[in-house]
Amino acid sequence: MATATSASLFSTVSSSYSKASSIPHSRLQSVKFNSVPSFTGLKSTSLISGSDSSSLAKTLRGSVTKAQTSDKKPYGFKINASYKVAVLGAAGGIGQPLSLLIKMSPLVSTLHLYDIANVKGVAADLSHCNTPSQVRDFTGPSELADCLKDVNVVVIPAGVPRKPGMTRDDLFNINANIVKTLVEAVAENCPNAFIHIISNPVNSTVPIAAEVLKKKGVYDPKKLFGVTTLDVVRANTFVSQKKNLKLIDVDVPVIGGHAGITILPLLSKTKPSVNFTDEEIQELTVRIQNAGTEVVDAKAGAGSATLSMAYAAARFVESSLRALDGDGDVYECSFVESTLTDLPFFASRVKIGKNGLEAVIESDLQGLTEYEQKALEALKVELKASIDKGVAFANKPAAAAAN
């Protein structure tokens, strides 16, 4: 049976690992999308309706047929959602579509939207969507504590967007201060929540968040995640296009970091197994690494990769919620505190459970090709510099960090 990835349908297919190997196999979740004419979001169900006419439903029905031949019981969502999610930066280019996608989740009971301005309109708009979760808006620092009260998952896309000619590192000073301030509030108001960092540069903002949490005495490395899912989504998409494969079958692990050469797709570990020429490996690797710039240039100054980032982040949020809800087979790639290399943080496939990070998939770094091994050694230098930059920023006196 061909393996499948959770990338193509973030809320319908998840990766799991068989006991015999570290190779992921698809697991269908019990989710139903209504057909487009009467779309009402995601619904908990035991089977995809045979009368559903949307193309997505047809795809899911095909997946159900495959799943029914498996000896694994599909994971079922709770009928009554019970998780609170806060999006910090909800009025931004990523925050708005991300909030919409999270609003569709059957696991979310309450969606808190925070920003320094313009968030009331976003909340009003989303509140008209007839999905179960209730939407509340919070504006400005004075309302941030209330936004974070009793939240289970905090998602942070806040920050300035990339512009043509701007690298992720150019964003550092502005976004570093934003992340530092927001994570301080998280530490004070919901220290046990899962924290998802989207704000770039992730290679530095995650270490900043870790240092802030340490200073507050509430750091739990199992609950701090740098969201690198977009790199996996892109790798799966580009490989499926290059090799004319069904996207739902493709799974490419991506390790390292979340900027430039620190993004390393392990094409040799692509599932299903695919043969690449040296030229294809080079072409795909470079395209995946520079995909963000590809979008920035295409938008000609009008924005960055907001929609694909929102999609990827929503997938990661959904995975975290499933883990909190008791699904024991949740795997994603993420930039986390790790002992996989000699670096303190590293992106790789991880297992997520009720209490956060449960395991780092060590097999990701085993059996690498010569090309991948050289790329790994090369990325470590740049990644270490970014991590050190984040740690140094977090430990600056407040006045110096603000400059």
Curated annotation (Swiss-Prot):
UniProt transit peptide range: 1-80
Q: Name one GO molecular function term.
A: L-malate dehydrogenase (NAD+) activity
Question: Which PROSITE patterns would you find in this protein's record?
Answer: MDH (PS00068)
Positions binding substrate in this chain are 162, 168, 200, 234
Annotated protein name in UniProt: Malate dehydrogenase, chloroplastic
Q: In which tissues is it expressed?
A: Expressed in rosette leaves. Expressed in meristematic regions of roots and shoots, cotyledons, young leaves, trichomes, stamen, pollen, tapetum, gynoecium and ovules.
One of the record's GO cellular component terms: chloroplast
Q: Which residues bind NAD(+)?
A: 89-95, 115, 175, 198-200, 309
